[in-house]
Swiss-Prot record:
It comes from the Eukaryota. This is Guanine nucleotide-binding protein alpha-2 subunit. G proteins are composed of 3 units; alpha, beta and gamma. The alpha chain contains the guanine nucleotide binding site. It comes from Glycine max. The helical domain (70-190) is required for self-activation. Residues 41-54 are annotated as: G1 motif. Keywords: GTP-binding, Hydrolase, Lipoprotein, Magnesium, Metal-binding, Myristate, Nucleotide-binding, Palmitate, Transducer. Residues 284-291 are annotated as: G4 motif. GTP binds at residues 49-54, 163, 188-189, 194, 222, 288-289, 291, 356.
Length: 384
């Protein structure tokens, strides 16, 4: 009898312990669920090369702890790969122009750089790139300064030349230092195509200030084959941040060189606006890469893009830049209203001029986004 009572006590004690553990797990799940309700979900969407991932990295620098040394070092092979890939693209481009252009002679690489060019072409075609040594950096610099490569670079919009080209080519000696560790600025310029989904949690006013909202920002791949991965993220979104690279009105897609990037952006923007799950979702449109746009617009007419074919320049210099920007902005506004159901046009829609590489601009923009969304939440709660 005593043995039976002892066993029962052990079983009862085990049951009580298990019940306590279950209750604790349920309590934690309930707390986490409540906490999740206070976290607003933001989707960062846009076509490939729109600057989404640069904005994502800026958020990490601005509103989190930034990149530690290990993370900075992890970008070293990426940056070196960007250098090798870019010089290969330029070398390939110069060959193509030399064969097909009427004024072909100016695209022919000088005799002293031909051997270097072939060597770098072979390296750029490898799957694994060597460490960027001082010798290789000097050879790349020599080829970069070759008149034929500079003429090719001037036609970069016809090729797939990345925006980071100037920056990395100007810093080759530093990038090839034996003890080189990438800087924060280097990381912002580094180009890696986003595949899948990455996320970050932040507050634009700082974690210790109760007045600010907490956001979870999702960055998803912009190339066409990545977009199917967005679907499961569509539910319960507080706002969509759509990035449009306005400087790319004369460029083609990485994945389809017959397709204009701005036309692709327009169609993607309209498709997202029409999704039923976004009927009540706020939209923040970032007209990005303004720094490149303001230089390009003075050289390349806006009406080379089919969407902007009715554009008429009115001035020169700064006035023309503003006129062109306002025209693009108006086109996106028209697209928004044409793609939004009449009973939903009152949902929050804001447009911001952005330069993803400019930390001050990104910080100011996200504080404005935060204010807009907090105001919307107060209105919905009947507190305004």
């Amino acid at each position: 009898m005593g043995l039976l009572c002892s066993r029962n006590r052990r079983y009862n004690d085990a049951d009580a312990e298990e019940n306590a553990q279950t209750a604790e797990i349920e309590r934690r799940i309930e707390l986490e669920t409540k906490a999740e309700k206070h976290i607003q979900k933001l989707l960062l969407l846009g076509a490939g090369e729109s600057g989404k991932s640069t904005i994502f990295k800026q958020i990490k620098l601005l509103f989190q702890t930034g990149f530690d040394e290990a993370e900075l070092k992890s970008y070293l092979p990426v940056i070196h790969a960007n250098v090798y890939q870019t010089i290969k693209l330029l070398h390939d481009g110069s060959k193509e122009f030399a064969q097909n252009d009427v004024d072909s002679s100016k695209y022919v690489i000088s005799n002293e750089n031909k051997e270097i060019g072939e060597k770098l072409l072979e390296i750029g075609g490898r799957l694994d790139y060597p460490y960027l040594s001082k010798e290789l950096a000097q050879e790349i610099e020599n080829l970069w300064k070759d008149p034929a490569i500079q003429e090719t670079y001037a036609r970069g919009s016809e090729l797939q030349i990345p925006d980071c080209t100037d920056y990395f080519m100007e810093n080759l000696q530093r990038l090839s230092d034996a003890n080189y560790v990438p800087t924060k600025e280097d990381v912002l310029y580094a180009r890696v195509r986003t595949t899948g989904v990455v996320e970050i949690q932040f507050s634009p006013v700082g974690e210790n200030k109760k007045s600010g909202e907490v956001y979870r920002l999702f960055d998803v791949g912009g190339q066409r084959n990545e977009r199917r991965k967005w679907i499961h993220l569509f539910e319960g979104v507080s706002a969509v941040i759509f990035c449009a690279a306005i400087s790319e009105y004369d460029q083609t897609l990485f994945e389809d060189e017959n397709r204009n990037r701005m036309m692709e952006t327009k169609e993607l923007f309209e498709w997202i606006l029409k999704q039923p799950c976004f009927e009540k979702t706020s939209f923040m449109l970032f007209l990005n890469k303004f720094d490149i746009f303001e230089k390009k617009i003075l050289k390349v007419p806006l009406n080379v893009c089919e969407w902007f074919k009715d554009y008429q320049p009115v001035s020169t210099g700064k006035q023309e830049i503003e006129h062109a920007y306002e025209f693009v902005k108006k086109k996106f506004e028209e697209s928004y209203f044409q793609s939004t159901a009449p009973d939903r046009v009152d949902r929050v829609f804001k447009i911001y001029r952005t330069t993803a590489l400019d930390q001050k601009v990104v910080k100011k923009t996200f504080k404005l986004v935060d204010e807009t969304l907090r105001r919307r939440n107060l209105l919905e709660a009947g507190l305004l």
